[in-house]
Amino acid sequence: MKGFSTTIEINSNPNTIWEILTESSNYHDWNKSVEKIEGNIAVGEKIKVYAKISPDRAFPVKVKEFVPSSKMVWCGGMPFGLFQGVRTFTLTERNNGQVEFRMQEEFSGLMSPLIVRSMPDLTESFELFASSLKAKAESVA
């Protein structure tokens, strides 16, 4: 199974970070890896993510899990389990007043070996997402 992940420490609080992560209309203002998000980021909702690496292509996902200020899971892919991407965002409050932000995406399904072989390396995009979130959260903290 192929996947990508990034982790960063943010000098802010989980509620501030969560507000930034879940306000879809403002992604273009702070996120250097996401062009825009269409839709409402809430459990059960379908949203469309437009990444800067492919700004003309929408990635439709469904918000599967939504635990305020803690965890969010987006899922998207092909029907019948042929291919699925699961992106998980977690916020963990540390004793030192920082919050650990982790974002990971894992791919699975029967078509996964073929599809992931042609995918670009998303490591840089994930790190840019995390550093953009850190900069925004620390500027409003």
What is each stretch, according to the model?
Residues 36-40, 48-50, 69, 120-123:
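Juxtamembrane/interface motifs at transmembrane-helix termini
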Residues 1-38, 42:
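Hydrophobic ligand-binding cavity/cleft-lining segments
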Residues 20, 30, 56-59, 84, ...:
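Alpha-helix N-cap/helix-start motif
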Residues 38, 53-100, 106-109, 135-136:
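Hydrophobic-ligand binding "helix-grip"
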Residues 2, 45-47, 87, 99:
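Short beta-strand micro-motifs in enzyme catalytic cores
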Residues 16-21, 27, 47-49, 63, ...:
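Hydrophobic pocket/interface hotspot
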Residues 100, 106-141:
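A conserved amphipathic terminal alpha-helix motif
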